[in-house]
Swiss-Prot record:
It comes from the Bacteria. Pathway: Isoprenoid biosynthesis; isopentenyl diphosphate biosynthesis via DXP pathway; isopentenyl diphosphate from 1-deoxy-D-xylulose 5-phosphate: step 1/6. The gene is dxr. It comes from Cupriavidus taiwanensis (strain DSM 17343 / BCRC 17206 / CCUG 44338 / CIP 107171 / LMG 19424 / R1). InterPro entries: DXP_reductoisomerase, DXP_reductoisomerase_C, DXP_reductoisomerase_N, DXPR_C, DXPR_C_sf, NAD(P)-bd_dom_sf. Belongs to the DXR family. Disulfide bonds: none annotated. It holds the Pfam family DXP_reductoisom. The lineage of its organism: Bacteria, Pseudomonadati, Pseudomonadota, Betaproteobacteria, Burkholderiales. This is 1-deoxy-D-xylulose 5-phosphate reductoisomerase. Keywords: Isoprene biosynthesis, Manganese, Metal-binding, NADP, Oxidoreductase.
Length: 393
């Protein structure tokens, strides 16, 4: 029996992970689950899966969860806070950790899992975007196994040489595909009128609201470019983004002999989740098999950086190196949060990120303290940008 900790169990990745676990009751068990605010959903998950431990964000949420579980006669141990998250990530009874907390909040527990030598199923982008070198060093030094769960990086992992899935050895280029989001063909002059609900209506994938907005701005793909650099050792000039509206080709690897290997499948996150859970084996994920005769044509185009300036900003941050990717991520999180709250326009997100990137001090990302300090300064600057733009509306 493989015991799984899920950081971010009530989000879309967490729920999909539990669905795969549910399909294989003799193979996997949920050992620990975490959520921030969705206490009732977490309680329902604990009642069904009976984890040994559960973690929430606050003492108040912990009291509520304890009451719900006590009434259901469920003996799950409840705790709260950042230290508790790190504890379940490094728990000696856990075989694998699904790192699915969205945003910078997932950084410390994901790093704790790596330092504990766990099999880390990485769905959290920020661990690599903010502190790529620190995180990859921890994976190597502590013997952790790192398996990417983002559909694109999981596809690249499958297309690279199995014994050493990294750039080199005949690899010419890494090709990340992107759907283009809901505004791929919309007149750029009308993008300032986009509502949060429109931005969250992804044409192919079911995702949380923050990631849906990132997909609409293509910042999501920009963060994935930075991830690909750290995961596979590919330099920025060897990472290319292609718009692929059908979301069937999840990514590709081009080789120096002219070969291009691609991973295809229906757009369902249970496929890469099942791959990560069972690696190097394969298990049923509950996903409808791909029928290419029904899929029709597969189309590809280059992204328009005028329409999607966030993608260009991410490449800029990767080339700048140091704390620049952490600054990019922090400013974007603040901008997206403000947009979802109705404080700024959709098109203000890129402007906030650009301004913070231009004004933030540079420096090496050689310690976690340096990364978190840069993150804090960037958030403060981004909030000032939000205030200025909100006042000007």
């Amino acid at each position: 029996m493989h015991r799984i900790t899920i950081l971010g169990a009530t989000g879309s990745i967490g729920e999909s992970t539990l669905d795969v676990i549910r399909r294989h009751p003799g193979r996997y068990a949920a050992h620990a689950l975490s959520a921030h605010r969705q206490v009732r959903k977490l309680a329902d998950q604990c009642i069904e899966f009976r984890p040994a431990r559960a973690v929430v964000g606050t003492a108040e949420a912990a009291r509520e969860l304890e009451t719900l579980l006590r009434d259901a006669s469920v003996a799950t141990e409840v705790s709260y806070g950042e230290a508790a998250l790190e504890s379940i990530a490094a728990d000696a009874q856990t075989d694998a950790v699904m790192a699915a907390i969205v945003g910078a909040a997932g950084l410390r527990p994901t790093l704790a899992a790596a330092r504990a030598g766990k099999r880390v199923l990485l769905a959290n982008k920020e661990a690599l975007v903010m502190s790529g070198r620190i995180f990859m060093d921890a994976v190597r030094e502590h013997g952790a196994t790192l398996l990417p769960i983002d559909s694109e990086h999981n596809a690249i992992f499958q297309c690279l040489p199995a014994d050493d899935p990294r750039y080199g050895r005949g690899v010419a280029k890494v090709l990340l595909t992107a759907s283009g989001g809901p505004f791929r063909t919309r007149d750029p002059a009308t993008l300032h009128d986009i509502s949060p609900d429109q931005a969250c209506a992804h044409p192919n994938w079911v995702m949380g609201r923050k990631i849906s907005v990132d997909s609409a701005t293509m910042m999501n793909k920009g963060l994935e470019v930075i991830e690909a650099h750290w995961l596979f050792g590919a330099p920025a000039e060897r990472i290319e983004v292609l718009i692929h509206p059908q979301s069937i080709v999840h990514s590709m690897v081009a080789y120096t002999d002219g070969s291009v290997l691609a991973q295809l499948g229906n757009p369902d996150m249970r496929t890469p989740i099942a791959y990560g859970l069972a690696y190097p084996e394969r298990i049923d994920a509950g996903v409808t098999p791909l029928d290419l005769t029904l899929a029709g044509g597969l189309h590809f185009e280059k992204p328009d950086l005028a329409r999607f300036p966030c993608l260009g900003l991410a490449f800029d941050a990767l080339r700048a190196a140091g704390v620049a990717p952490a600054v990019l991520n922090a400013a974007n999180e603040v901008g997206v949060e403000a947009f979802l709250a109705g404080q700024v326009r959709f098109t203000d997100i890129a402007g906030i990120v650009r301004q913070v990137l231009e004004e933030a001090p540079s420096g090496p990302a050689d310690t976690l303290e340096a990364v978190l300090a840069a993150d804090a300064l960037a958030r403060e600057a981004a909030r000032a940008g939000v205030t200025a733009r909100a006042a000007a509306r």
